[in-house]
């Protein structure tokens, strides 16, 4: 904390370069955020770093007889230090993406990265000699398509190394993220997401997590709609493989929200809603309601 006689003052800058042509897209960025720089009127999640990025894309185009319309081969290099020139992270990635029929798009990416873990002595800011450096190799696949005119589906798969920051060690991640959006009618839209994530280290799992997010919207008319949101998470943390932290073996959450919205005019919307949350851990045998809320608000979009 600062005393009344102390002040913070530092500098920040960012340079961007981009070039686009029919077959090439090039980009470069240099950013510097001083250790004592603060952006009180803007979002600044971290300071004390300098970062360089270089990216290049080579584009290819299909002809009338091809099943694909466009393909891209990409490469990106990134490096980040603190302002004392101590390495925080650097990575090199390459990817291949292709656009095909049914509004489909697929991307395969390989990433090699070096990153530092937690500081061994948290009372000092030094990175060199005070952290462990880890090497990550990851494979990422993303695919999306519209099997029907009213349906969108996507899947993302992440496999490979990932730092277990809670325990300052290298682990192995398996993560699958799926999404289906169905416009069931002119009024009804159903949007379902599910994420499965598992981290392993030292031959055993660290955690297994499942997250389901369901959103249902019903447009009553041009002025009003109903929206229901249900979010359920189930996290199983291995109490025998988290040596640096105390964890709960069972963590389950269920939250729900129902909102009615009515547009009074193009600038004003009235909301009426209900929300609740439920929780379970090692000390509970079932989901217990934590809180419930009834609320109303009026939103006005002011235009000068």
Feature locations, PLM:
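Exposed, low-structure sequence patches enriched in small/polar residues
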Residues: 1-304
């Amino acid at each position: 904390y600062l005393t009344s006689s102390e002040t913070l003052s530092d500098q920040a800058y960012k340079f961007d370069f981009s070039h686009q042509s029919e077959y090439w897209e090039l980009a470069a960025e240099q950013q510097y955020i001083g250790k004592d720089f603060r952006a009180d009127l803007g979002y600044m999640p971290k300071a004390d770093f300098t970062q360089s990025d270089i990216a290049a894309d080579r584009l290819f185009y299909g002809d009338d007889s091809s099943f694909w319309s466009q393909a891209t081969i990409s490469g990106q290099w990134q490096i980040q230090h603190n302002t004392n020139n101590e390495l925080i992270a650097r990575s090199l990635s390459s990817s291949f993406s292709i656009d095909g029929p049914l509004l489909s798009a697929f991307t395969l990416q390989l990433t090699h990265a070096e990153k530092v873990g937690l500081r061994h002595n948290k009372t000092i800011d030094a990175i060199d000699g005070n952290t462990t450096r880890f090497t990550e190799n990851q494979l990422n696949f993303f695919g999306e398509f519209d099997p029907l005119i009213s349906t969108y589906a996507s899947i993302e798969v992440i496999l490979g190394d990932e730092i277990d920051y809670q325990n300052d060690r290298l682990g192995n991640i398996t993560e699958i993220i799926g999404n289906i959006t169905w416009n069931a009618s002119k009024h009804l839209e159903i949007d379902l997401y599910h994420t499965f994530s598992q981290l392993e280290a030292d031959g055993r799992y660290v955690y297994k997590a499942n997250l389901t997010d369901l959103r249902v919207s019903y447009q009553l008319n041009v002025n009003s709609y109903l929206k229901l949101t249900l979010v359920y998470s189930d996290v199983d943390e291995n109490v025998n493989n988290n040596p640096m932290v105390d964890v709960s073996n069972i963590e389950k959450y269920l939250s729900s929200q129902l909102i009615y919205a009515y547009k009074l005019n193009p600038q004003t919307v009235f909301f009426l809603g209900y929300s609740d949350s439920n929780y379970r851990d090692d000390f509970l045998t079932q989901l217990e309601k934590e809180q419930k809320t009834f609320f109303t608000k009026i939103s006005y979009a002011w235009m000068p």
